[in-house]
């Protein structure tokens, strides 16, 4: 197939541009997708979502307090938007970056998978993807002159990623690992 995926920063911060780009793609029969954290109110993002062929979003942590600790915001809006997305019938996928000591607990992955199984009533979630930790983000912290809290952290062993995949699959959803 192929197409265009708009990613960030955060795409929803540039929504008018993203909508114009999606319209231009569709005018040329090019499919369009976004990668997003879905942290904006649904009524603001729904016009863009309606135009897309696919939405890829992150859900890092199931617990809102833990989400706030690690990202600076709670996850209520994100989870509400995933529910809206599932109800909309739009094809989507959800990803969790596996950050050692932050998002990689059995409980977190099981809770996210259970939530996704609960909301995927129209079976339009293509799959849930577990993304192993990528230490390449270090340059971002350096460019912002901030200390990287994950400096020196290594990706999870393949066996551990497969174990988390198995835990998530117990919710009855399709789970991929990268």
Predicted regions, residues:
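Short glycine/proline- and charge-enriched loop/turn segments
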Residues: 142-151
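A cross-taxonomic marker for long C-terminal extensions/tails that follow the last structured domain
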Residues: 158-178
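Conserved AdoMet/S-adenosylmethionine-binding subsite of the radical SAM
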Residues: 1-136, 140-142
